[in-house]
Amino acid sequence: RRRRVSVDGLRISANAHLIMPYHLLLDLAGEQKLGKLEIGTTRRGIGPCYADKAARLGIRMQDLLDPKILRKKISAALEPKRLTLRPHAKDPRLDLHAMVEEYVTYGHRLEQYIADTSRLATEYLDAGRTVLFEGAQGAMLDIDHGTYPFVTSSNPVAGAACIGSGVGPKDIDEIWGIAKAYVTRVGAGPFPTELEGELADELRARGREYGTTTGRPRRIGWLDLVALRYAARINTLTALVMTKLDVLSGLDPVCVCTAYRSAEGADLDHFPYHQTVLHHVTPHLVELPGWDDDIGDCRTLDELPEAARGYLEFVSEFLGVPVALVGVGPGRDQVIWARREAAIAG
């Protein structure tokens, strides 16, 4: 509202879990305890919140609407955490009465937006309207299919859209995957194509690659087509959106990874399931021609330099997925709708 953005259409699932003050403290304590083995979380309490959800100790949006239930649930959630939270015993954020009062106030402010969002989405679908589900993080951070334990606490893969939204798998018509023209990662974990030195610094500066939540500089590397093909498979992508193609302008050659070599010298054209193997692979890089042109004003595929089109075609052919949208700058209008023309066929 302060930014003059209407929130009239905002609806929040009554079943959505809340990150509570004690989750933040637990997240920080957990990372500090791991020391050099830390996962590199955002320390925003996400992991402990999911842990409470699995333990049936979570606080949900609907709980904010009943002070008595809220108090009982917060008290029950705090009980098994007393020992871990002992160093923070005097932290005012852990005062039960104050916490209940604060979150009941939130409930009063948000009550008009809390709804059965599953029913709402189903009604829109039944009426023939378009419903878009947007995932967060990425496939390689999926708790089941990603680079465990260096992952998030949920399932960002496409299949989880049904679980999170409460609609059925048959309601999903298209699945678009989004990938940068290079690879970034925040925090620890394997990164076969990681770059260091001046080139990494240049790409990071061009792409403004700093964590949205933490502000930490992102690790950066060449596009990993082995990992991207794996992501395309587990998400059954129907189209690919490639962003930040403009960041590669001025580089020649531009490299992509098409295979790994294991520590034992074996060539791997698939994403290895064993983390020990993944942590010790080296990338097989293919050099593609670069381009010098500023592509920020391009709005059709034909306006792109030949080398830039060749880069997109190489990626699409390798993945077997058509490119539907290309980002050529930070502006919302700096996109090429390849699907409107004819998607670059995979």
List where the protein language model places each region:
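Non-transmembrane, aqueous-exposed alpha-helical and coiled segments at domain scale
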Residues: 1-346
